[in-house]
């Protein structure tokens, strides 16, 4: 991989060097934009957005093919809003990202993009996303805007650097993707839409606290008051188990989705709770945090994909 510090702004293509090509520079540029947008976060959240869309179609008694344009607008809008929020997060955190191993290669740290460029890209993505959501229903656009405000202002600009409650605040914004998806089809928001929201809300603290445990020294160096940094691992474990325990009955409230869903949700939930409780006896806290982190990713993916499958 080329480790050159040469800027890859399109205006600097000529200066890229004799061994570079326009295609190489463009490829790097697109990769950098994907890093700014936090592609992994956007992709995983689009799964939950699609689940919200599909379930709304099912429970409004309409036909999937009638909503193809709405689905495209909703997915594109949600993706852009999330990408915009993540890009703005990169812009705001550019002064501390160099202190953390997992963020030190972001384009805002390496200088591949100027701060002004990143700010403009983030604002443009967010604005376009809200416009696309508005083409579905006003409710979807409002929810997207609220989620964006919570993530960028209340989380990134305020609580992330000031309180251990940052994870809870961020969980509100992280829980809106399925709500956006449902609202794009049905602005009235069925009870099931809110249950999807609460599942996402309760899932996020144990997921991100596991990450915080894994990266505790990096967060400490960056001065970010994550719970493991401020209160230690034991308190963090207790809070993680509380959220996992609360998530189990909420996920089972969707028992009308059928026996297969109910059984799988119960097994997934009990398994995660058992792993959480096992953490109080494991000697290697970091290993346990890794297991919890991986389990959380599998839990979310399996649960939301299953919600769609059982309704085919």
UniProtKB/Swiss-Prot annotation:
Listed PROSITE patterns: UBIA (PS00943)
EC number, UniProt record: 2.5.1.141
Transmembrane segments: 37-55, 70-88, 111-129, 139-157, 229-247, 260-275, 297-307
Example of a GO biological process term: heme O biosynthetic process
Cytoplasmic topological intervals: 1-36, 89-110, 158-228, 276-296
Annotated catalysed reactions: heme b + (2E,6E)-farnesyl diphosphate + H2O = Fe(II)-heme o + diphosphate
Broad EC category: transferase
Location relative to the cell: Cell membrane
Gene Ontology CC entries for this record: plasma membrane
Membrane topology annotation: Multi-pass membrane protein
PANTHER family according to UniProt: PROTOHEME IX FARNESYLTRANSFERASE, MITOCHONDRIAL
Protein family (similarity comment): Belongs to the UbiA prenyltransferase family.
Protein name per its UniProtKB record: Protoheme IX farnesyltransferase
Protein's organism: Alkalihalophilus pseudofirmus (strain ATCC BAA-2126 / JCM 17055 / OF4)
